[in-house]
Amino acid sequence: MIILIDSGNSRLKVGWFDPDAPQAAREPAPVAFDNLDLDALGRWLATLPRRPQRALGVNVAGLARGEAIAATLRAGGCDIRWLRAQPLAMGLRNGYRNPDQLGADRWACMVGVLARQPSVHPPLLVASFGTATTLDTIGPDNVFPGGLILPGPAMMRGALAYGTAHLPLADGLVADYPIDTHQAIASGIAAAQAGAIVRQWLAGRQRYGQAPEIYVAGGGWPEVRQEAERLLAVTGAAFGATPQPTYLDSPVLDGLAALAAQGAPTA
């Protein structure tokens, strides 16, 4: 059994992959903890049906958090290898000028999405809405040409609340023409997030001559879903397309499982 770890800025998501089980079994459902609650990780490890052999993970929460996670795993008899982005893995080619500068979570997420595809597939747009929002494209040639990073919905809201003298920590509904400050902030955040998706969808369509399929993930997606789907529908209609995002619960863990299954380079 191999433990899969996705250590984000706010949440720690965990799962497992068992290459020795029939059909290389996965966890029934991933489990998420607050990233500061490593006792919860230890308790979860104690519930596993088998003793894990090792762990594979990504960590964007800093060196100290990675060391604390590793110590918790070692206490359970399990060492971890932290993934780094590679120039090439699982058929996915990294287009970054310096491939290892790409966040390991983004790399694993793209590997997870690509692992779901048939050998011939359209362009893929992978959008993850966490503390940061990332939008990454995979071409039909399995090349990642680049992507965007912007503050996630909660970070945008916090920046306005704590970086200004008079704006509140907004809790409002999205509207075309907001009529109070809470609505104005909520609508601006949704517009920024949705606009980034539409921008990259249009860029992919222009680059590849066909509309990208959209995959979305992350805890911030429900907040922007309605606005994103509305703008995508309006934009797609101009090209006779109906872009419809597909939500994935744990594409980073899916990517880690795929890499572990194939013995692909991880560091």
Curated annotation (Swiss-Prot):
Please give the chief subcellular localization of this protein: cytoplasm
Gene3D superfamilies named in the record: 3.30.420.40
| Disulfide bridge partners, by residue number | none
Q: What class of enzyme is it?
A: transferase
Residue numbers annotated as active site: D105 (proton acceptor)
> What's an example GO BP annotation here?
coenzyme A biosynthetic process
Quickly give the catalysed reaction: (R)-pantothenate + ATP = (R)-4'-phosphopantothenate + ADP + H(+)
Q: Look up the domain of life of the source.
A: Bacteria
Please give the pathway this protein is involved in.
Answer: Cofactor biosynthesis; coenzyme A biosynthesis; CoA from (R)-pantothenate: step 1/5
Pfam families found in the cross-reference section: Pan_kinase
Q: Does the keyword Aminoacyl-tRNA synthetase apply?
A: no
Q: What is its EC number?
A: 2.7.1.33
Q: What is this protein's function?
A: Catalyzes the phosphorylation of pantothenate (Pan), the first step in CoA biosynthesis. Activates transcription of the pertussis toxin operon in a BvgAS-dependent manner. May interact with the alpha subunit of RNA polymerase.
Descriptive protein name: Type III pantothenate kinase
Q: Which organism is it from?
A: Bordetella pertussis (strain Tohama I / ATCC BAA-589 / NCTC 13251)
